[in-house]
């Protein structure tokens, strides 16, 4: 724990130090553990074998920093020495300077890394399980086996496709309303209403299997290839801002140490809490929103645009870009009392058109989510992101299939 705390402090200084002191290649003199920040946590991300060359950046403490995925890794200085003789990093095709491919691999076990795309090659080291790591290229060896080319410590390395999987995207889960079974007499057949029992079981399932719950900021980093995230991760979202979220979802999420995002219809925020009535759709008050801020991040679900017209179509689809932009701006102002960084939007009823997308961009939203079914992948249009529903009647096996690394529709 002490070592990880030191590394966390180092991350605050690495950028400025490395700008002044250029990276240099050094060689490991023994097998060395490496650390990096993955999501919210500083964890051991693998090891590098003795005799391997990597480019490191000097730091002010007893660790070197080096490029690891979309961030920095750290290695004890005592494991390295200046490169001896004429050894050099192989890069005959200039792959080190090529852009990344918008694709990651995921590790589900300790995964061997090699110096060349061949199982007979000298081992470089190991990547730990539960990582997403960016891929430069996919290659075929002479036996027609697929290899992933990666960049680590400003050098090339290779992972067999037999040892890792392609990253099929992050699951953004969508919820709305939650009720206890015995009080749910009006919304039992409404697909957007789940039960407290089902929600608790789903969150317990995620917790027991080591899933991290990500913020929208982290999702943005994933889409834009700027952050290292774990393989087992989901984003939990609630649309509308219903009172049942604070009454039922919040205690469950807090119990399991999870975080979530609530997309709020700001015109429906109440000045004072309403008396609980499970037979109506009630919305959270100012005080109720403040009480759940330690778990929930509040983002926009528009101000007055969460309505339908006479044909049951989202009213947003008939509004001008100017009117939509005005509403988006009003929603952001209303949420500023809870969150100074209102950067994310959920389109009402999942409806959008060119006017809505342009207004979202002009309003300053970094990401916007829809109700289109599927997972989010690096390089996706940030203002047209997909999500997944898990229904009250869905089994845990269905949930497992949705959040696992299987492709979705």
Swiss-Prot record:
Q: Does the keyword Signal apply?
A: yes
User: What name is this protein filed under?
Assistant: Uncharacterized protein YadE
Reply yes or no: does the keyword Signal apply: yes
The protein's matches in InterPro entries, at most eight in alphabetical order, are given as:
Glyco_hydro/deAcase_b/a-brl, NODB_dom, Polysacch_Deacetylase
Source organism of this protein record: Escherichia coli (strain K12)
- What taxonomic lineage is listed for the species of origin? Bacteria, Pseudomonadati, Pseudomonadota, Gammaproteobacteria, Enterobacterales
NodB homology domain span:
232-409
Q: Which Pfam families match?
A: Polysacc_deac_1 (PF01522)
Keywords attached to this entry: Signal
Q: Which Gene3D superfamilies match?
A: Glycoside hydrolase/deacetylase (3.20.20.370)
Q: Which residues form the signal peptide?
A: 1-19
Which GO MF terms are attached to this record?
hydrolase activity; hydrolase activity, acting on carbon-nitrogen (but not peptide) bonds
Q: Name one GO biological process term.
A: carbohydrate metabolic process
């Amino acid at each position: 724990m002490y070592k990880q705390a030191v590394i966390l402090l180092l991350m605050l200084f690495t950028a400025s130090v490395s700008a002044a002191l250029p990276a240099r290649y050094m060689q490991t003199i023994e097998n060395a553990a490496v650390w990096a920040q993955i999501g919210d946590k500083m964890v051991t991300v693998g090891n590098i074998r003795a005799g391997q060359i990597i480019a490191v950046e000097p730091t002010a403490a007893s660790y070197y920093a080096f490029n690891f995925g979309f961030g920095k890794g750290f290695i004890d200085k005592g494991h390295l020495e200046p490169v001896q003789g004429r050894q050099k990093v192989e890069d005959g095709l200039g792959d080190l300077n090529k852009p990344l491919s918008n694709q990651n691999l995921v590790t589900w076990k300790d995964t061997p890394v090699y110096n060349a795309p061949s199982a007979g090659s000298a081992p470089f080291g190991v990547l730990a399980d539960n990582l997403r790591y960016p891929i430069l290229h996919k290659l075929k060896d002479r036996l027609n086996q697929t290899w992933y080319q990666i960049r680590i410590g400003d050098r090339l390395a290779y992972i067999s496709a037999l040892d890792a999987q392609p990253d099929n995207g992050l699951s953004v889960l969508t919820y709305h309303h939650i009720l206890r079974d015995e009080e749910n007499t009006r919304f039992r057949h409404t697909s957007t209403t789940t039960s407290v029992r089902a929600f608790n079981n789903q969150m317990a399932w995620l917790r027991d299997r080591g899933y991290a719950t990500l913020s929208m900021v982290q999702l943005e980093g994933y889409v834009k290839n700027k952050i290292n995230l774990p393989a087992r991760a989901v984003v939990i979202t609630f649309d509308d801002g219903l009172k049942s979220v604070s009454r039922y979802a919040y205690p469950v999420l807090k119990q399991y140490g999870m975080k979530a995002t609530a997309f709020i219809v700001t015109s429906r925020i109440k000045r004072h809490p309403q008396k609980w009535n499970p037979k109506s759709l009630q919305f959270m008050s100012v005080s109720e929103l403040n009480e759940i801020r330690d778990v929930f991040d509040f983002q926009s679900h528009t101000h007055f645009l969460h309505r339908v017209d006479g044909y049951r179509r989202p009213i947003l689809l008939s509004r001008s870009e100017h009117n939509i932009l005005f509403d988006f701006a009003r929603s952001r102002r209303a949420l500023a009392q809870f969150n100074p960084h209102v950067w994310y939007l959920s389109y009402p009823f999942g409806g959008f058109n060119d006017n809505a997308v342009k207004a979202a961009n002009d309003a300053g939203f970094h990401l916007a989510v829809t109700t289109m079914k599927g997972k989010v992948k690096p390089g996706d249009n940030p203002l047209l992101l997909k999500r997944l529903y898990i229904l009250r009647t869905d089994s845990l096996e269905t949930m497992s299939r949705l959040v696992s690394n299987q492709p979705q529709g």
